[in-house]
C-alpha cells in the first residue's frame, strides 16, 4: 500500500458574536491601531526609561494581539517569554482597565546584565528585568491615577521570581550510614528555606 501524506493547515480565528474575524496580515495604525516602535519609546519616555531600550514594542501591538485571542474571555493568562521592557504587562493592565477583564500576565526574561558603561547601569540598574519591574510599577500607578474610580477593582500587583538554587537538599545516594538517610527523611529542605520558598518551588 502506498503511504498517504496529509498536509493539514489549521487556522484558529477568534469569534466576535456569531461571526469569524480573520486578522489582517498587516499591522498598522490605520488598519488596526497598532503603533510603531517610536510610540513604544514615547511610552517609556513618560516613565523616564526610554534611554534604556532601542526598539521597545508599543503597548498597542500587544493589546491588539491579546484581544485577538481573548476577545470573549476575561480570565486568561498571557505568557511572554521574551519580555524585555515589560510592554506586555502594561498592555494587559490597560486591557483589563478598558474591558473590565481580569487577564493575567507571566513575563519571562533572562537576567541579562547591563554593560557597566550603559545608561541603565549608571542609573543604578543591574539587569534588564530590574528596569522592567520599574516600568510595571509606574505603569500600574499611572493607570490607577488616571482611573481613580476603579479603586481596588483593578489588580496592578505582581510577583517577581528569580532563578536560584533549590530549597530541597541534595541526597547522597551513596551514603551507607542509616543515620544520614533518616536525617534526610526528617528534614529534606535547606536550613534557610522559608515555607513560602518551598511552596512556590513545588508549585512552579
Task: List the model feature ranges, each with a label.
Residues 26, 105-107, 160:
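Conserved beta-strand scaffold positions in the cores of enzyme catalytic domains, especially
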Residues 62-142:
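Conserved S-adenosyl-L-methionine
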Residues 118, 122-204:
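SAM-dependent methyltransferase catalytic region
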Amino acid at each position: 500500500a502506498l503511504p498517504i501524506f496529509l498536509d493539514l493547515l489549521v487556522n484558529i480565528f477568534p469569534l466576535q458574536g456569531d461571526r469569524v474575524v480573520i486578522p489582517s496580515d498587516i499591522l498598522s495604525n490605520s488598519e488596526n491601531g497598532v503603533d510603531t516602535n517610536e510610540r513604544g519609546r514615547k511610552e517609556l519616555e513618560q516613565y523616564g526609561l526610554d534611554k534604556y531600550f532601542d526598539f521597545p514594542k508599543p503597548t498597542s501591538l500587544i493589546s491588539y494581539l491579546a484581544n485577538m485571542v481573548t476577545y470573549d474571555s476575561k480570565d486568561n493568562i498571557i505568557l511572554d517569554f521574551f519580555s524585555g521592557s515589560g510592554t506586555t504587562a502594561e498592555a494587559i493592565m490597560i486591557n483589563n482597565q478598558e474591558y473590565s477583564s481580569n487577564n493575567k500576565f507571566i513575563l519571562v526574561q533572562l537576567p541579562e546584565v547591563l554593560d557597566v558603561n550603559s545608561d541603565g547601569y549608571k542609573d543604578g540598574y543591574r539587569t534588564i528585568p530590574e528596569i522592567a519591574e520599574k516600568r510595571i510599577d509606574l505603569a500600574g500607578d499611572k493607570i490607577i491615577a488616571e482611573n481613580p474610580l476603579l479603586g481596588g477593582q483593578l489588580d496592578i500587583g505582581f510577583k517577581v521570581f528569580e532563578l536560584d538554587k533549590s530549597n530541597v537538599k541534595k541526597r547522597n545516594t551513596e551514603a551507607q550510614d542509616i543515620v544520614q538517610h533518616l536525617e534526610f527523611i526528617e528534614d529534606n529542605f535547606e536550613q534557610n528555606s522559608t515555607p513560602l520558598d518551598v511552596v512556590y518551588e513545588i508549585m512552579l
